[in-house]
């Protein structure tokens, strides 16, 4: 039990936020119950009133950075439809606050909520660079592109403080090992010195997420992310430095950004992207509840229509977990999205080719000795 102040009246088992007002600067507007936890929790109004009277700060919107110490850092990706074989996540949870993020559910495995906890409690893996180096020195490891990150953005705000992603990139460069990056943060340009060296040997590919050309849409979907203008500038800077960029127009959400596919494709192509990918939004696990709560607070006039159109893409449900279908959807609306994406590729990417990364430069000696390059 946690004792609040000196008054046993305020003893509570645990605390979780249950907001009534709109929380600016956050995607999720509440914490959902953790499906793995035995008890559900609630932050009571009387506790908040107690904090006000006593002059104590409840820190309801403060981000916490919590160190964790995993034994391994390179993860084998078993899903056959996500376009990567291995991932590395320097952080768990993400302060960007993207309301649709599929990684929210993973926070429940750590005992937290997929809602506000996902954005406020960031788990930091400070040992990631050392664990990565140990993996690359392993006798059994065979070169295959490792993606930063398969789950949460490796250039989220925490990276500016901890620098774990940069340290990992230094390891990849040292071992001449191919690496991919997925981000929507302009902080990636901080590491241009390392990225250009990797690019010279065809060891790097950067995926930049661009979900809308509307700042209004961006602000409500992804409240703590870089502006669209800055993301397009990021694509341009990377491309000008001969770093191959794939744009992620994901997720496509019917009724919110589905009408922007052609304009988005043109914008990222003009900025220098060599290709683009897309997914149709699916709201698996706790994300369905979080998204519905969010859309009824932010876009109440469109909420029912958007939710219905998402369901139309997934057989009447907000989620479809079938491999090969879950990220593209089915039905009339999903087909329209696919057709628009196909047209965009033909119109803006027809003569562009995305390079295959080089796995031949990486060769480790047994016993952890590295062949000199």
List each language-model region with its residue ranges.
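Auxiliary Fe-S-binding modules of radical SAM enzymes
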Residues: 4, 9-65, 69, 259-373
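Glycine-enriched alpha-helix->loop->beta-strand junction motifs that scaffold or abut catalytic
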Residues: 200-203, 244, 272-274
């Amino acid at each position: 039990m946690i004792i609040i102040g000196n008054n046993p009246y305020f003893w509570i088992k645990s605390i979780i936020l249950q907001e009534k007002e709109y929380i600016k600067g956050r995607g999720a507007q509440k914490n959902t119950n953790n499906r793995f936890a035995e008890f559900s929790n609630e932050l009571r109004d009387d506790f908040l009133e107690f904090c006000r009277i006593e002059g104590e700060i409840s820190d309801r919107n403060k981000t916490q950075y919590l160190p964790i110490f995993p034994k391994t850092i390179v993860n084998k990706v078993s899903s056959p439809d996500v376009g990567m074989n291995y991932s590395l996540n320097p952080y768990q949870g993400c302060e960007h606050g993207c309301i649709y993020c599929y990684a929210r559910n993973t926070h429940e495995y750590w005992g937290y909520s997929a809602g506000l906890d996902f954005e406020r409690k960031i788990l930091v893996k400070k040992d990631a660079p050392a664990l990565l180096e140990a993996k690359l020195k392993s006798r059994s490891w065979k070169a295959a592109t490792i993606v930063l990150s398969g789950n949460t953005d490796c250039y989220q705000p925490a990276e500016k403080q901890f620098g774990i992603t940069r340290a990992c990139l230094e390891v990849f460069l040292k071992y001449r090992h191919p690496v991919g990056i997925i981000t929507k943060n302009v902080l990636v340009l901080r590491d241009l010195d390392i990225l250009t060296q990797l690019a010279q040997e065809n060891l790097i590919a950067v995926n930049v997420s661009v979900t809308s050309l509307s700042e209004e849409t961006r602000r409500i979907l992804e409240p703590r992310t870089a502006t669209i203008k800055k993301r397009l500038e990021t694509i341009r800077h990377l491309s000008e430095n001969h770093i191959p960029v794939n744009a992620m127009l994901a997720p496509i959400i019917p009724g919110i950004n589905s009408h922007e596919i052609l304009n988005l494709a043109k914008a990222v192509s003009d900025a220098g992207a060599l290709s683009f990918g897309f997914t149709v939004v699916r709201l698996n696990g706790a994300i369905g509840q979080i998204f519905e709560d969010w859309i009824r607070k932010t876009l109440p006039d469109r909420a029912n229509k958007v939710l219905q159109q998402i369901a139309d893409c997934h057989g009447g449900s907000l989620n479809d977990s079938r491999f090969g279908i879950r990220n593209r959807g089915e039905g009339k609306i999903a087909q329209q999205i696919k057709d628009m994406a196909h047209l965009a590729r033909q119109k803006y990417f027809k003569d562009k080719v995305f390079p295959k990364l080089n796995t031949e430069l990486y060769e480790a000696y047994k016993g952890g000795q590295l062949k000199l390059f």
